[in-house]
Amino acid sequence: MSAVAEAPLPIQMTDAAANKVKTLITEEENPELKLRVYITGGGCSGFQYGFTFDEKINEGDTVVEKSGVTMVIDPMSLQYLVGGSVDYTEGLEGSRFTVTNPNATTTCGCGSSFSI
């Protein structure tokens, strides 16, 4: 008998984020959609978080599954997101996906850009 140890996920997705993704996928009527989280250059702090839906998992993507939904991250973005968590919040600023990123040394006031 052999036991397979699961490696800890390099990035987490909260229940709130998973539930919102599930709702959005249901509204789109496309069960193939996955939440793609990525990093782009820009913003007041140098890097910005991006979120989009994608039907494909590309070679090298990291896949995180939670509550029946899939989040994918490309290798270049993952290096900036390791140890982080994707959440969904609703508040006075509106509703949005957010990233808690332990690698970020500074963030802007709105939380959508960061530097390392």
From Swiss-Prot:
Q: How is the cofactor bound?
A: Binds 1 iron-sulfur cluster per subunit.
Protein name in the entry: Iron-sulfur cluster insertion protein ErpA
Decide whether keyword Zinc-finger is in the record: no
The terms describing its cellular component in GO are: cytosol
Q: How does it assemble?
A: Homodimer.
Its GO biological process annotations read:
iron-sulfur cluster assembly
Main function: Required for insertion of 4Fe-4S clusters for at least IspG.
Q: Look up and give the organism this protein is from.
A: Aeromonas hydrophila subsp. hydrophila (strain ATCC 7966 / DSM 30187 / BCRC 13018 / CCUG 14551 / JCM 1027 / KCTC 2358 / NCIMB 9240 / NCTC 8049)
Q: Keywords of this protein's UniProt record, alphabetized?
A: Iron, Iron-sulfur, Metal-binding
InterPro entries named in the record: FeS_biogenesis, FeS_cluster_insertion, FeS_cluster_insertion_CS, FeS_cluster_insertion_RrpA, HesB-like_dom_sf
Named cofactor requirement(s)? iron-sulfur cluster
Which residues of the sequence carry a binding annotation for iron-sulfur cluster? C44, C108, C110
